[in-house]
Amino acid sequence: MNYKGKAHKVGEHIDTDAIIPARFLVTTDAQKLGENCMSGLEPSWASRVAPGDIMVAGRNFGCGSSREHAPIAILGAGMPVVIGHSFARIFYRNAFNMGLLLMEVGDEVDKISDGDALEIDASTGAIRNLTTGAEITCPPLPASMAAILAKGGLVGYVKERLAQV
């Protein structure tokens, strides 16, 4: 899986309430959630995102309440990948289950600035900053996680597996 897009940096300890505030949890429609992605920090944030852009986060991204709406909102905003210093564990699992790729890179995240053009090869874990030339390597995903992502998330993966039984 390859991705190319503009970086949208967000801060540290961004919780799921900032990603998608509770007042928007009345739907699971990805487009509607995407229109309100990050509105807990800035109401018009999602309007700057183009399809294929990449979110870049600091430490402990996705902390707080466990809600599948948060990764759905990110996907609905058009961002298929979040590169981060670190992720809250429950958000990490929810993201993959919903089909959102997370790449945990530690302090290497500092090699990316807001607006940088990025290119990602998820199969190898290679992240290239096309703006600066910096290269970041993230461990490749385990085969089981890559298989879930390839089916758009856990529901698609399970449906396919059940069809084979």
UniProtKB/Swiss-Prot annotation:
It holds the Pfam family Aconitase_C. The keyword Iron-sulfur does not apply. The keyword Protein transport does not apply. Gene3D superfamilies: Aconitase, domain 4. It catalyses: (2R,3S)-3-isopropylmalate = (2S)-2-isopropylmalate. CDD domains: IPMI_Swivel (cd01577). SUPFAM superfamilies: LeuD/IlvD-like. Pathway: Amino-acid biosynthesis; L-leucine biosynthesis; L-leucine from 3-methyl-2-oxobutanoate: step 2/4. It is an enzyme of class 4 (lyase). Its EC number is 4.2.1.33. Heterodimer of LeuC and LeuD. Catalyzes the isomerization between 2-isopropylmalate and 3-isopropylmalate, via the formation of 2-isopropylmaleate. PANTHER family: 3-ISOPROPYLMALATE DEHYDRATASE SMALL SUBUNIT 1 (PTHR43345:SF2), 3-ISOPROPYLMALATE DEHYDRATASE SMALL SUBUNIT 2-RELATED-RELATED (PTHR43345). This is 3-isopropylmalate dehydratase small subunit. It comes from Desulfovibrio desulfuricans (strain ATCC 27774 / DSM 6949 / MB). The gene is leuD.
